[in-house]
Amino acid sequence: MSGIDQKRIRNFCIIAHIDHGKSTLADRIIEKTGLLTSREMSSQVLDNMDLERERGITIKAQTVRTVYKAKDGEEYIFNLIDTPGHVDFNYEVSRSLAACEGAILVVDAAQGIEAQTLANVYLALDHNLDVFPVINKIDLPSADPQRVIAEIEDVIGIEAQDAPLISAKNGINIEEVLEQIVSKIPAPKGDKNAPLQALIFDSIYDSYKGVIIFCRVMEGTVKKGTTLKMMATGATADVVELGIFGPGQFIPAEELSAGMVGYITASLKNVKDTRVGDTVTDAENPCKTPLPGYKKVNPMVYCGMYPADGAKYPDLRDALEKLQLNDASLQFEPETSIALGFGFRCGFLGLLHLEIIQERLEREYNLDLVTTAPSVIYKVYKTNGEMLEITNPSNLPDPSEIEHMEEPMVKAEIMVTTEFVGAIMTLCQERRGIYLGMEYMESTRALLRYELPLNEIIYDFFDALKSRSRGYASFDYEMKGYVPSELVKLDILINKEEVDALSFIVHGESAYERGRRMCEKLKDEIPRHLFEIPIQAAVGSKVIARETVKAMRKDVLAKCYGGDISRKRKLLEKQKEGKKRMRQIGNVEIPQKAFMSVLKLDED
């Protein structure tokens, strides 16, 4: 291990839009370098969560080390760091890129460049990585490699004439990619004898070993027994074991030196101590400065999670704690709701992150959950000069105490075929978007730039974008900052009682429309009772929309055959009195489906 020549190490990652074949290319590289035989291969080797395979996305960054015998007769060590491609995990991507010297840009020969590709390429170029393109899926009937090559050169401005034309699925031209990794990606620099400086690009929790740190050693050497110090969190621990990555397994080694990628286990019990992007150094001989680029990741989207069965509250807490061991960006704190009982207010990086956590809780821990509408962090400035950060609409102060409110904005890039430009611009306008500009990529596609409120895109913007563009639009965003906005709290009252779990903060202009649609939706979902149930949407004390669930009633006139009208009226009045009394003391059963349906207002 210690005799590894730095010049023969290649640290690289693969960047691509969802579905352009990133994980498949990683599979082929692993297979071609003989790390796994074709019998041992399973598709998407590096995506080892069931959820990752099903959705076809990479959630956790994975790493694998393989040895390649090149045509020049030398053996090269490849460290492939597989990165998540989704915008929610942008910070994880940037840290994984910082651990590499180069990147392979995979572009689909049929679809060309997409918004996510652009975002990740710019991220790679910001980290001064050497990027070389690979055109994938050339076996498709609709493939047009020459058009895609021209597009890469025009839009990104990197040389693409000698880009390998491959089919990762069928294993065509993979050798050429391996040779280009050797020739185009530089070897790592770094002095083995300098003080230790290593970058954490991921960490996982193992129930036997504790926290396992995935790191790239930039300077110096780390051995067993070294006392490590995390520069951002200040945590210290002794190295118990270290080594390199095989597919799905850890291979222990004697030491890790400058340029190498590997894992370290130390006697750490909490992933929060080993934050992604932090610098690891030797506690006795520390490096002078930490590596640049570390930032604490803050959740963007919050929502309430409640067990459908109140007795499962401790199980939900245990499950969230276990997930948090592996995912430092997940935050949660206990909260109570009058309608839903005990639960947690959870913070996520974005909507995909929320969906994944929810699905994992339901699958891996067999929990039945009710989630409230997602919310972002609003800044509320009070008349007494105090500033509050609000994630839960129930915590909003009285309107008389609020001077003004601010909401987060994002800068969005939407890639769309020209025939749908009008439809997408209308969608952005509906969502209070501010138009920034538009560029035509070639005659058939355009890149739209908009500033949008985060509040408007966390609900169902992505679904609406896909449906209005028949699945052709792709979308990427980054945070812009806060702007003042006319926001109000929309309350839902069922049978004259406020249901806190259905309240949310909305822009004043869209309050009426949203309230009306929510009332209509709830009317369909709440079953009829023996008394009539008013469903109202209110802003402050003003009711802005109302629907009524009609009462089920017994036919009290069935036993009157003919007879005087006053007799019938007496029976009807008696029934009416009974219903009125019932409405005052009756409880309304709100099914779980009603809470879920409110989240999906735009799917009608």
Curated annotation (Swiss-Prot):
Keywords: Cell membrane, GTP-binding, Hydrolase, Membrane, Nucleotide-binding, Protein biosynthesis. GTP binds at residues 19-24, 136-139. InterPro entries: EF-4, EFG_III/V, EFG_V-like, EFTu-like_2, G_TR_CS, LepA_C_sf, LepA_CTD, LepA_IV. Its EC number is 3.6.5.n1. Residues 7-189 form the tr-type G domain. It catalyses: GTP + H2O = GDP + phosphate + H(+). One of its GO terms (biological process) is positive regulation of translation. It is found in: Cell membrane. It is a peripheral membrane protein. SMART domains: EFG_C. GO terms for cellular component: plasma membrane. GO terms for molecular function: GTP binding; GTPase activity; ribosome binding; translation elongation factor activity. The keyword DNA-binding does not apply. CDD domains: EF4_II, EF4_III, LepA, lepA_C. Belongs to the TRAFAC class translation factor GTPase superfamily. Classic translation factor GTPase family. LepA subfamily. Required for accurate and efficient protein synthesis under certain stress conditions. May act as a fidelity factor of the translation reaction, by catalyzing a one-codon backward translocation of tRNAs on improperly translocated ribosomes. Back-translocation proceeds from a post-translocation (POST) complex to a pre-translocation (PRE) complex, thus giving elongation factor G a second chance to translocate the tRNAs correctly. Binds to ribosomes in a GTP-dependent manner. HAMAP family: LepA (MF_00071). PANTHER family: TRANSLATION FACTOR GUF1 HOMOLOG, CHLOROPLASTIC, TRANSLATION FACTOR GUF1-RELATED. This is Elongation factor 4. It comes from Lachnoclostridium phytofermentans (strain ATCC 700394 / DSM 18823 / ISDg) (Clostridium phytofermentans). The gene is lepA.
